[in-house]
């Protein structure tokens, strides 16, 4: 393995490195982190194994898409703030473009699709989220206290299905975890290879908090659609713990009840997001393109994409200087453990409503779901292949029926 290289790169070099991964990194956030390790630790030698492990730990602690945040942190280490932006752009651009094109095509030619294809995509979404619930539950809810937090969180958001209920559940689970859970402190490693002053970090954290508080107020005072979209997607990007799939219930609660995107289109787009490389958060580009009223299309996609990723950039840049101290605190890690248990509950609730209730309507749907789960869990089939197979099978079932 090459030794860690401290020589800076240009933002263009960072962009091209992440663009390659954005075109090829299938498999979700855990797989993305493996791709990053192979490319930037083992092959390029940008940083050491221990420094990379620390970056991953930080980004799993923060809300937002962990793999995208690790990418931004790597870009920040190599080329400063322009490098962080270049890494984020390169990694998200391919999947965002594909999903926008899918949204535009669905709006224009969706009626021409064979009957049952969109329903097959819904069934694929059920299978993919069920796989995520199973894997995250085994990892993040290993004991009775965390299983209890998970169950209470799921029941709460099903009983009171609003975005603010989800926020309250996450906050309450964090407090409960801090009070009830016991975790081990992390032993020290070498310092992360990123130099950011505390003053600059506080500026980024302040901007993050100001936007989180002020955007909902602004959207109420000036009910312009672009401001509502900015608020909804910024808030979703600020409050998602546990990875890309957890954004599903937050975004569904924001866009479907308000009529910006109908339920069938939402689930079809979510399934399509499983079939493209890169971060699942680029689902925001699909929703922005498919939403109504304006802005939508390309401008709506760009607005929603920037809004959902902006919190990640602000948090990574703001948290890095403080992470060396915080990662040793048992109480901080216990708080995070409680939050992680809650997000499994949120995802379980989303698996039932809307995914199961709108996707599994007849025995044939359940049979197709079983085969999709078998492919994902037993045969380890890539999700994009399962999505395509379910779309084809849905069309065939509708034709035969």
Show where each model-derived region lies.
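Multi-pass membrane proteins that catalyze or facilitate reactions on polyprenyl-/lipid-phosphate substrates
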Residues: 1-62, 73-276, 280-401
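Conserved beta-loop-alpha segment that forms the PLP phosphate-binding cup at the N-terminus of a helix
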Residues: 66-69
């Amino acid at each position: 393995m090459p030794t860690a290289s401290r020589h800076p790169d240009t933002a263009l070099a960072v962009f091209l490195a992440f663009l390659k991964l954005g075109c090829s990194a299938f498999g979700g956030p855990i797989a993305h982190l493996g791709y990053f390790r192979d490319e930037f630790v083992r092959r390029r030698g940008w940083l050491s194994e221990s420094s990379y492990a620390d970056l991953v730990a930080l980004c799993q602690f923060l809300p937002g898409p962990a793999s995208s945040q690790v990418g931004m942190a790597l870009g920040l280490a190599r080329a400063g703030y322009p490098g962080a932006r270049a890494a984020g752009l390169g990694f998200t651009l391919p999947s965002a473009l594909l999903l926008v094109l899918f949204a535009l095509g669905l709006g224009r030619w969706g009626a021409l699709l064979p009957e049952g294809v969109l329903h097959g995509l819904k069934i694929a979404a059920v299978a993919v989220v069920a796989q995520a619930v199973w894997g995250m539950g085994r990892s993040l809810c290993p004991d009775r206290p965390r299983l209890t937090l998970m169950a209470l969180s799921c029941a709460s958001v099903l009983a009171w299905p609003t975005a603010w209920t989800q926020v309250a559940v996450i906050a309450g689970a964090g407090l409960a975890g801090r009070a009830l859970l016991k975790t081990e402190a992390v032993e020290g490693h070498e310092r992360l290879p990123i130099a950011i002053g505390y003053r600059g970090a506080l500026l980024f954290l302040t901007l993050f908090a100001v936007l989180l508080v002020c955007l909902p107020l602004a959207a109420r005072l000036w009910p312009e659609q672009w401001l509502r979209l900015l608020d909804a997607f910024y808030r979703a990007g600020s409050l998602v713990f546990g990875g890309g799939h957890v954004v599903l219930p937050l975004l569904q609660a924001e866009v479907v009840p308000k009529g910006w995107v109908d339920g069938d289109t939402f689930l079809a787009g979510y399934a399509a997001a499983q079939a493209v490389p890169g971060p699942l958060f680029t689902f925001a580009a699909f929703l922005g393109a498919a939403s109504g009223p304006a802005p939508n299309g390309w401008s709506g996609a760009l607005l929603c994409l920037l809004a959902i990723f902006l919190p990640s950039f602000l948090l990574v840049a703001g948290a890095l200087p403080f992470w060396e101290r915080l990662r040793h605190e048992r109480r901080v890690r216990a708080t995070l453990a409680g939050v992680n248990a809650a997000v499994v509950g949120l995802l379980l609730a989303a698996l039932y409503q809307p995914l199961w209730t709108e996707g599994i309507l007849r025995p044939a749907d359940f049979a197709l779901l079983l085969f999709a789960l078998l492919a994902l869990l037993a045969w380890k089939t890539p999700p994009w292949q399962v999505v395509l197979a379910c779309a084809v099978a849905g069309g065939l079932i509708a034709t035969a029926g």
